[in-house]
Amino acid sequence: MLGPSGSGKTTCLMMLAGFETPTHGEIYLDGNVISNIPPHKRGIGMVFQNYALFPHMTVYENLAFPLRVRKIPKDEADKKVDKALSMVSLQGFEARMPMQLSGGQQQRVAVARSLVFDPQLVLMDEPLGALDKNLRESMQYEIKHIHESIGVTVVSVSYTHLRAHETIL
């Protein structure tokens, strides 16, 4: 999704995610109306520009949080967290706190958290905006690889056409 600042891109994502309510119309996902479904029951992962990691939780706890909300048994949650960390090449980082990670590592944790519960759709609000050029290019490749390997639909927002053409999946 491409548009200038203030054009409603983030608002659109927030409505898809269920954090804001549309004033008119309905939202459909895979042919089903989801407008009145709570965010945690929509099956949508979200990656924010600022990562939105819980600073008081470890990497493992950040990834396990959406699974706890969905009441996934711990043994199954452990497997899902391991799989998500593997997808973003962060095995062995489970016990670290977000502040102990680089910006790129934090972003990969945010991506893993958006995927850990096997969503139908992943929304990304300027997910690479805070990263330097080299890291941004590396993360674009990783996100594209994840998209291709697991087949999840990704909607990404950008305010600049220069970044938009780089992130087309």
Language model regions located:
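Hydrophobic anchor residue at the start of the ABC signature
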Residues: 111
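Helix-to-loop junction immediately C-terminal to a conserved catalytic motif
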Residues: 17
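Conserved ABC ATPase signature
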Residues: 97-101, 105-107
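Single conserved hydrophobic/aromatic residue that forms the stacking wall/gate
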Residues: 161, 168-169
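Conserved ABC ATPase "signature" region
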Residues: 33-35, 68, 75-93, 144-145
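A short, proline-enriched helix->beta-strand linker immediately N-terminal to the Walker B motif
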Residues: 116-120
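Short coil-to-helix segment of the ABC ATPase nucleotide-binding domain corresponding to the Q-loop/switch region
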Residues: 57-65
